């Protein structure tokens, strides 16, 4: 397995956190209590700032300083005679840091102050928003006000390896020395025999991205995506997108990359065609709608560079390879390392110039990203600037190399901050319902101005504020057109006209925003009371008028909320995906790792999601909605590739998404990482889904791969899965041999749910309701008389947890459940001793909400269990019980009354019927059923964690007992009885031979052939 150097440098990360004044606590980043860190200084200087604002300033300051260190390292690697500028003898305080930020990086050389340090003279003007003051800084929270105080060195500081006697340093000196201790680029001295040797201290842009993601990602549910994932996804999706685009544009029929390369070769020497190919290549639009640290966009950038090299449509003058998501540039067999050339016609200059401008063109034209977190957006911009900085070159004037590095362009405009899932206007919203010729022409002019202004912004070498104002004005105009056509506005105007004609405008109070706005709307649209022969005065308010007014207010509130809801308007935010008439054309490729936020954390967003997404389901996690949003913003035929949780393929909350995907997309491939921990910071099982936006054929083949380790093979051996294997009920990725077997087993049996009542255990909502035998005896001893003792003992029942259940056996753990179920309608005053015990847990057991220190809010009383448990009598019956979070899925027969917590499921006989419990236990514990569980539930493999929800387990088929199979069923039951007896005598008894006999009988029960049995045994 190829070593991935783009992994977290834990020593760097830990010490950086310490210097910044942050620490990790329970998967969160919080401000530490260490004195004289950067956070401590900010908090001391600006004591009214909220913690989020302090962290925002920290990230902003740190991002800039790290960029400066990378810039310095790049300049030194380009010019070995340059001594750098991040020296403590030059940068003596935070005031000088402030000068670097705003008087140097943010100021053209000719406009800089003359009193700046000499070492700053070679620093190029960075034409980017990274060094524009943030709103917090504009409010006076600036770095120059900070005072560098002595900070104790981190216990395992990298600085101690050089001087063990050093114990403290002033913060700024410590910070700079720490950054200087690491390499932020590879210089010629770091390359020996064409191999980089500085991996231990190298902090490349990918590693930085990982650090920034960890600093920034916990709150948003985002996790840094490993390079082996981003590189595979970008290669696969971009290849498909390029082939699709060129086939569509030139009428080609290339089926793969080799076919595309061969087609390009046939046009070598045809400059006119090559120019057209360049334009097509640079018109491919790729978007990450949850961009995070920008890892996918950087990976896409490098892969597009590599593809430009392979297709030979851009002259680069060097050989290019990709490794660990990074570009490797070779010239004449050696690793290419740009240094300041002596002659202006140097080949190295040409290579660096070509790479810089190709990267610039791709970043400006092809890469787009959105994130709800402004810090994430800044980090993404930083990473793209770093990628461009790698190939910055010295300018040429009068055929001579100068000391002036090429200025970096404004590449930040393609990365925007907003809520990707929330838009006020659908993608296909018209700018006008019945546009006139004049409006159509005016709109086309606006779109042209919009595109032109964006290009001027990217090329601008001076103040960008005027262009930004122009862009905001154009977007306001476009948004205004859409708002006029919004259903709420149309409804408001229609109802307002009807209302005023009959009831007049006197009801609108000019002192309120609503009243004033409605009077203005009525005046602007010439809505007046219209006298009639019958009504010469406005009609007094009646029920009809009140209803109209209520609807007007409702529409008004919708329109007002649109002004402040942080919506992101995909409809017009990126002019690159608008045609000349303003129609939304869409992206060629949508790629990413949407945030993983559980549905419990997005309750406040569910109402909006329900209104706007077909895939909505009450329990759906937020990544589900990104699939539909990604589909919306794709062009027809475009490709989407996401890595997400794989639960949607089988979970109940994924049914609407499954329906959507089957109806609206052609699924191209599915890579499952079930049981492989792809993300170090997340335990969720993941998969990569790739689809094309097109109406699918009736049936087609899907490429399927089950990854067993943390890598994707270079040439994956995909299985071909028929589309018919996927249904709304579940995506079952079974092979061609497995699918018929699955269908045969299903058709041979009756779903488990039809054998009896399936219920889960008791959700009490508090540990107070689960007690030990000693506590039970204490409560009973405190009863005042025998009658109370008898009553109380009747509602304290034996209970078990999942850990008490094994295959064919269980062991009660001396625990009891206080069964004060709401369904029993008990009066707690009848149980004084029990009341006294439970009262000791108040208010923790009061139904006042967890946010108020109690249990979940609900209609139950303080002494009752959280769930109603109307089926409490089922616990008293004979039952088959299983623990759905155990990877081996133990099924056990329990005859005695026994209660459970809510992690356990049971099936009992329906009233008036008998449950063949031993038969069910034998079949469900068989090898066949364990194989079936893997196919039909979220089970990973035997022994691994899984959760098989009720909706999946209840579908498992068991053959009904009839005259044809009675003898087989009797043998299974007899073997189960023998196993139970042996386990009763000695729980450690080995019963595998008896279980093997049951396995063979179960295969016969389902009429399986030897080949089918072999398939199950191998699985």
Please tell me what each predicted stretch does:
Residues 672, 883-900, 922, 930-943:
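Short, ligand-facing micro-motifs at secondary-structure edges
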Residues 424-565, 579, 584-585, 589:
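Basic, amphipathic N-terminal segments
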Residues 287-289, 370, 630-635, 695, ...:
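Proline-centric
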Residues 291, 741-757, 833, 840, ...:
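Non-catalytic DNA-recognition/assembly elements of restriction-modification systems
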Residues 45, 251, 259, 263-285, ...:
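Flexible, glycine/threonine-enriched loop-and-boundary segments that flank and lead into catalytic domains
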Residues 48, 52, 64, 540, ...:
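Polyanion-binding catalytic cores of nucleic-acid enzymes and NTP/SAM-utilizing transferases
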Residues 1-10, 14, 73, 298, ...:
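Signature of N6-adenine DNA methyltransferases within the class I
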Residues 1-306, 316-317, 341, 366-379, ...:
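Preference for the N-terminal adenyl/adenosyl cofactor-binding alpha/beta module
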